[in-house]
């Protein structure tokens, strides 16, 4: 089974989370193809080619989607991902009033096109640290278990 792992990262925090998740998913016997949304060739219409999806983003400003995610978000509305398992994650900053709002926005869009979104969403304060290891492992295990059903 092949998983598309797509992420947006400005400071490297979400990229670091993506690498940890990718390593763990591969250890649990799924293949992962990783895409940086800004630099790699991945579009919403490509998602149908994968068995499951992991999507990571940071939140811009007071709760906005990052610029590089906006077109993907809009294009996602035209896709049918009924039954596809999707795990959402990202780095967040508690300095801002809308903690991880972009992750929630993407989750709603994936749900609107029929995806089976893994709960809870994985929100990490800034860069992942040792205190986040267990939460990331739990998120990854829930995701892989749903995919293998």
Predicted regions and their residues:
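Short acidic active-site motifs
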Residues: 39-43
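Extreme N-terminal starter segment of soluble prokaryotic enzymes
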Residues: 1-4
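Short hydrophobic segments within beta-strands
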Residues: 6-8, 89
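FMN-binding flavodoxin-like domain, especially the glycine-rich phosphate-binding loop
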Residues: 13-16, 23-24, 28, 35, ...
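Residues in the short beta-alpha loop(s) of Rossmann-like NAD(P)-binding domains
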Residues: 9, 38
């Amino acid at each position: 089974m092949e998983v598309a792992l797509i992420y947006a990262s400005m400071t490297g925090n979400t990229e670091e989370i993506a690498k940890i998740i990718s390593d763990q998913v591969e250890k649990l016997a799924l293949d992962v193809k990783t895409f940086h949304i800004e630099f790699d060739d991945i579009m919403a219409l490509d998602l149908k080619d994968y068995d499951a999806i992991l999507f990571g983003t940071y939140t811009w400003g007071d709760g906005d989607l990052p610029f590089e995610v906006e077109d993907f978000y809009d294009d996602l509305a035209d896709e049918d991902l009924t039954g596809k398992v999707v795990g959402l994650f990202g780095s967040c900053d508690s300095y801002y009033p809308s903690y991880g709002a972009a992750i929630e926005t993407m989750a709603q869009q994936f749900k609107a096109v029929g995806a089976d979104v893994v709960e809870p969403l994985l929100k990490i304060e800034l860069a992942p640290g040792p205190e986040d290891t267990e939460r990331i492992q739990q998120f990854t295990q829930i995701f892989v278990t749903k995919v293998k059903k």
